[in-house]
Amino acid sequence: MERRELFSFLSSSLKGAGNEKEIIIRPPYYSDITAFDTECQNCDGKCATLCQEQIIIIGEDKTPRLSFSSSGCTYCDDCAIACEPDVLRIEDRRLIDVGVRINESTCMSWSGVMCFSCKDPCLEDAIEFKAMFMPTIDQEKCTSCGFCISRCPSTAIDIKVMSS
């Protein structure tokens, strides 16, 4: 078992499996959230196919959603360009509608372990460390791209959908 897998296993056993409601995070190029349910039903999912980071997945309801389990969003515009039903449009570019925060009770750094896994991939330098072991996310700098989420070995970064 690799180190990252070990930490993920340990932290998931602390959180309690199956207790969380599914969080649906939409790609960042929409203006009308209801259009996902009405316009995506007959689409072939090109937004997911062309996503460079492969974070767009098509759910059972045939609508696109983001999964930060392996990577984050670069805001490259490819999903909006590929969207034939025009649910995603470049002119509607916005930040991903989630709030991101570090859960101090499951964060390895907050427990005294030297870990910078969340800070390293952050292109906006939004993760700041108070002293050496207390990371926080500067919400003014954070673009909610999700790169920190996939890199955290203890899954200590929580996501909250801001709008629906």
Region spans (language model):
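Non-ligating segments of multi-cofactor redox enzymes
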Residues: M1-S164
